[in-house]
């Protein structure tokens, strides 16, 4: 049937002369000839180079018509053209058989050649939009298939069915897969995004497959704020029941790690659990208390230090300290996010006297400055567009260099001190040129904004105006999404620094609501944080139920997250009551106080994923679990020495001669942030009674510190 549709489509068009741009290039793209692993790679393949995904049709046309002395196109005997012989395996082809001589694709290319192999009108042949049917696939259970239909509209007013020439990809093939003809098969419960691409136009079709289980009844859970409203609306539609609310002890541990980076003390847990006032009110009050503590600034300084690459390797020791203190001051004063970013992007002068200028110590090259700024502050990855038009987004190579031009005059020179940098604007002209044709690229915003103009004498100020504008559709959204990921384990758009049409949000109304709230409160990050952690969604238990066990996308239950390196180190010290001495820092210092990754380098913190701060990507910090980490927890000195510390928690409890019950309870609260269950208490009491009480207590603490309950924030 699909073959017949394609034949019919070609026959209908046969009256009109075929052109490369409208009729042949789609075949090249569909067959993968222009893909990265094939001829669209940086160096092409087997001496034949095409533009990646056909972004430069004029280049590709010349490669076919004139390269190899025209051997790819045989004007007198078209059937002997390499462009036909290779993909049909008339001669050996490294890419294998792409189509046979009886296929519609072969016949269309042959007809085009016989008609003279015209390039065509690049304007009239431009695709202006795609009609995609269905626009959404939603099925009550796995099994049904759906056939896509894609109609392309062209600049000359014509349209055609391009279903069989369209490229399809499923983001989650385990949930739904799609064949070359656009037939979508639903495989199992879940959600996927069907990416539909045709000649530079892209559309995303959401695919939802329900579990197909009977007996679902929506529980109408209470809602603390608008977050819960948007989350619950989607859960109800997907027939997913959210988990129960976390216990007070679970909440206390979770929110403490998330807000201040360290666990609550046993005394704090006891007091919070004993408070019988309204749950929502007392939790909200605890959030306020934690955010007022100095550890709040310490913890979030670590996150911003990662993103802004605070490291003495790049900034020098004095520069790193200055930048670190500026970050701390910005967080402590709750500086509006837009103001903070503006100070970074427009910074000039000494990296010692004006700390935001350190931003350009690691982005001194204009292209790096542009790529880092857009990825960090807009969640947009422009790197692909440096060499070619972005294959999955609207950004072009020309736009890449126009945006880079805002940093064209910026430079960094040495200061009075050997490690000091001075950021300045060069007086002489420094042109950013397009690599394809050498054209000088004038600064131009990535998308138009009538409120702002490019001021030639204030290029970075002009960029900052546009970047931080309230109506910039990426700036506030990227930050709202990033902050959400810190508390929920993944972004609504994930990865958080890869916002594009082909990477849609898991809950678009929720992200829009968070963004609007952030804007309505004038880029107040603390308000955004409080809103998230006060939601019932954030406070749900990590324990799943019969209806949400498979869900890892819609926030129906908390996602356990491995503690960061700094959190884990500080949690070990808090649980054991030990004060380990590390080089360069005071005995009382926590890992969250460390300015850069050179403190205690090569030890526990690096093993558990502390980043070297070489990039501004969240991906540099590792939160995986490895065998080497497990062995360190089992046998490493950080754990064993802390447990056995003669001035640590266990030693002090033994000196007080507390009962076994109180000893076990204290160790559970210190390590896991909860009281032991009855069976755990019984087992621990029996173990303590079998030998040396001190050794048994250390064994118990060792077991707790090696459990998932300690390693993960859940």
Question: For each of these PLM feature ranges, what is it?
Answer:
Residues 15-106, 123-151, 159-224, 252-254, ...:
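Solvent-exposed helix-loop boundary motif
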Residues 29-52, 114-122, 381-396, 539-540, ...:
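Periplasmic/extracellular electron-transfer cofactor-ligation site
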Residues 1-4:
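Positively charged n-region of N-terminal signal peptides that target proteins for export
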Residues 576, 583-585, 590-598, 603-627, ...:
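Long, His/Glu/Asp-enriched segments that create or flank divalent metal/ion-associated functional microenvironments
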Residues 99-119, 628-635, 639, 643-644:
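Catalytic cores of secreted or luminal carbohydrate-active enzymes
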Residues 7-15:
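Hydrophobic h-region of N-terminal signal peptides that target proteins for export
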Residues 69-70, 94-99, 314, 558-559, ...:
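Active-site rim elements
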